[in-house]
Amino acid sequence: MDIIVKYIDELLEKSTPEAPMWNIEKIKQGLKSKWNYIDGCMIKAVLQMYAISKDEKYLKFADDFIDYRVFEDGTIDGYNVNAGKTLFELYDLTGKEKYRKAIDLVYSQIEIMPRCKSGNFWHKDIYPNQVWLDGMYMGQPFYLEYETRFNNRKNYDDIFSQFKFVIENMRNPLNGLYFHAMDTSREAFWCDKVTGLSQLSWLRAIGWYSMALLDSLEIVDNSDHKFDAEVKMLQDAFVDLINSMIKYQDE
């Protein structure tokens, strides 16, 4: 834990909202840093440090960082659903109404996202009809948390359906790993023209996906056991994936 604290503290000391060290490549290129998925991942980690240590410096950094990007009317300097995950906890901890407004704004973006025929969200507008493992991490936990907190779980079935599609169509039965992406239209140059799948399993994407499963399991409200089967589906998929990855770990 001491090593983690030292690493995080040094990272934060050298970072500002305008120039976070985790986006150093953009800084070196002279590009402006905007609200992005890396910010979401890193600020979630900072908030985890606050939850564990109760050291106010972590909360202050996270709040200052996100506050800089979110305007009083809830509009945001940039578009990214993943970074929106930080807003729930910061709203709880600070009570800032602009965070609540920003949560609704991000959700409104989810409502109009284009979808594949399967019902899954496109990964991005520039990747039509494509489902990527990365996108399951970037979008589904936010979607699930909003439904849990503010929408009476009305779209739980939609969320579980998107996970089910990935589990049934993107898992490699030969090794238990998942292919990085699938083009449901079979048009992308990289996809198998029969299955629509990419040729490779990518460790980083599998990491995103495993966290999508785990984060969703932590968020889901199944107190009335209405979604027992769906929760078990996610649990089984997570355990199966971890057991499959262990076979490939370095000794």
Would you name each region that the model predicts?
Residues M1-E251:
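Glycan-recognition and catalytic cores of secretory/periplasmic carbohydrate-active enzymes
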